[in-house]
Design a protein with these regions (language model features):
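Metal-ion/cofactor- or nucleotide/acyl-coenzyme-handling active-site neighborhoods
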Residues: 1-182
Length: 182
């Protein structure tokens, strides 16, 4: 069984929480914003200007960097950089999270989501509504099992209705996965 950790771009792990136990279990996917704090193994960057900066800083040497194919071509196809296709025809919060969800689900059977704010919000901005909807669609269509970690509040309805998603606490998930790897 292949497992992947998926960190939301605004993830804040509890103080003192080392990511090494997570990394010992499975690779970590997330936005470029998570790489420095959490040493994300697989880094997604949708933004063309930021992708150019990351390439210049050598991110492709320290992680698996994923950028849009169109950006890759405009940057003269830099070595060691991975590409993905697709586009967004409407405004979406945290595009990197959506792309990372799709990519991680393409290689893992179980995706463990950390740091995601999936709380129901009345009168949410359309960009947030689109984010929740696209994330729910990615989870539903993947056919994989998803685990939301440390999310104490009620989930937004499109996420709550999914049959392939569960919730748990990070210490429980780490203990369960460590026990299964022995």
């Amino acid at each position: 069984m292949n497992i992947a950790w998926l960190l939301a771009e605004n993830t804040l792990l509890p103080p003192g929480q080392d990511t090494q136990p997570m990394r010992d279990i499975a690779p970590i996917w997330g936005s470029w914003r998570t790489q420095r704090a959490y040493q994300t193994d697989n880094v997604v960057c949708w933004d063309a200007d930021q992708a150019a900066i990351l390439i210049e800083q050598g991110y492709a040497e320290i992680c698996n960097l994923y950028i849009p194919k169109m950006v890759y071509d405009t940057l003269n196809q830099p070595p060691r950089v991975n590409v993905f296709g697709g586009a967004f025809d409407f405004v979406v919060d945290s595009v990197d999270d959506i792309v990372a969800a799709h990519l991680s689900a393409s290689v893992a059977d179980v995706i463990i989501m950390v740091g995601f704010d999936l709380e129901s919000r009345p009168n949410a901005k359309i960009s947030r509504t689109n984010y929740i909807g696209l994330l729910a669609q990615s989870i539903r269509d993947s056919g994989k099992q998803w685990v939301i970690v440390d999310h104490p509040k009620n989930l937004d309805e499109p996420i709550q209705k999914l049959s392939n998603i569960t919730r748990d606490l990070l210490p429980n998930v780490l203990q369960l996965l460590n026990n299964n790897s022995d």
